[in-house]
Amino acid sequence: MNPVLAVQDLRYELSGDGRALVDGVSFTVGAGETLVLLGRSGSGKTTTLKLVNRLLVPTSGAVLIAGEPADAVAATQLRRRIGYVIQEVGLFPHFTVAANVGLLPRLEQWPEDRIARRVRELLVLVGLDPDTFAARFPHQLSGGQRQRVGVARALAVDPPLLLLDEPFGALDPITRVELQREFRGLQGRLGKAMVFVTHDVREGLLLGTQIGLLDSGRVIFLGSPDEFRASTLPAVRQFMEAA
């Protein structure tokens, strides 16, 4: 069986100077697995996610979704197979919570009653009472509530793959811990393949089934959380000492 996501020798160069922001990156992620990409700022984590989602086009290498080359699929269709959650959430400010969560199903021309059921189901899943929150606007929500809505929206059309880029990074420490705990529960219930970007090693070790450490655009470590903890690689030790 093909993994949900396979990244093969991915390279991305800046046009003009040939400098690689991502260089030779390879990994696979199966259903129910969460690959955490760790690394300092500028190490290539977010660029890698954008290459998977075709927000950027790789210079060379391949991205396969369920065995199908991503570049063989229309970009709009590809993004409907991939849920994307970012730190800034990106909710439409003049849409209600229900309209934000139901946006992709509506673009997919789902019947309105099916959209309404899906919105309620997802709000319950992420811990928001639909009767309380569905009619609210993003400015009426706390940071943690907005992030929950962002996760619900990413799940709306049931994509097999979720990409999460520092989703809890802008939250206060208490809310961040709450959402990390809730996210662990969602992992087991959803069975999605996930790629989770963070610079927080404690968060990565808590949430990941695999850890990938990037440095200057290259994966210098790929293994389980226990293997990461036991590694003698100097770059890994630096991260562990900062935990």
Model-derived features: positions:
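Catalytic Walker B motif of ABC-type/P-loop ATPase nucleotide-binding domains
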Residues: L162-D165
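Short helical segment in ABC ATPase nucleotide-binding domains corresponding to the A-loop/adjacent helical element
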Residues: A98-R106, A116, R120
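Conserved ABC ATPase "signature" C-loop
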Residues: S216-G217
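Helix-to-loop junction immediately C-terminal to a conserved catalytic motif
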Residues: N53
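Conserved ABC ATPase "signature" region
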Residues: D113-T132, G185
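Helical segment within the ABC ATPase nucleotide-binding domain
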Residues: R176-L190
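ABC ATPase NBD coupling module
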Residues: A70-G83, L107, E112-D113, F228-T232
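Conserved signature/switch motifs of ABC ATPase nucleotide-binding domains
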Residues: H139, V157
